[in-house]
Amino acid sequence: MSYTVIYAGTFDPMTNGHLDIIERASELFGQVIVAVAKNPSKQPLFSLEERTALVRQSCAHLANVQAVGFSGLLADFAKQHQAKALVRGIRGSDDIEYEIQLAQLNDKLSGRLDTVFLPPSVTWRYLSSTMVREIYRHQGDVAQFVPNAVLCALKEKE
């Protein structure tokens, strides 16, 4: 399909699970905008600029993917970029109720914005940024869970 979709998150840090969803979305849609969110209620490991750069580096092999930092309402960001839909990853039943509420809210706020749910590949179903941060904070090896650009950035923080 030749239209633009948005995959949004804080990506703190970006994981191989995120990359899996982005790669699959890039095969399905004409353009994928990875919207890297500034969330004032969280204390990020990386700044918005760093997270956006890490997503760009991790997705450099995908010609139809771009990373853009943003703050504010996702529905407004989607309108500004003329996106037809949002892409959301759903790991399991715990995510479904929240994600459906979020999808309905974004649709209502935007006037018309569909949400496409993609389950992660089985390999990454259990993975989250929170888990990666916890492993990292306890000096564990996160190499198998994050793209190389993220791994290098984490090592620089040590």
Swiss-Prot record:
Entry EC no(s): 2.7.7.3
Protein's name in the database: Phosphopantetheine adenylyltransferase
Gene: coaD
Signal peptide: none
UniProt: ATP binding residues: T10, F11, H18, G89, I90, R91, E99, W124, R125, Y126, L127, S128, S129, T130
Chain positions of site Transition state stabilizer: H18
MF term (GO), any: pantetheine-phosphate adenylyltransferase activity
Key word Glycoprotein present: no
Alphabetized UniProt keyword annotations: ATP-binding, Coenzyme A biosynthesis, Cytoplasm, Magnesium, Nucleotide-binding, Nucleotidyltransferase, Transferase
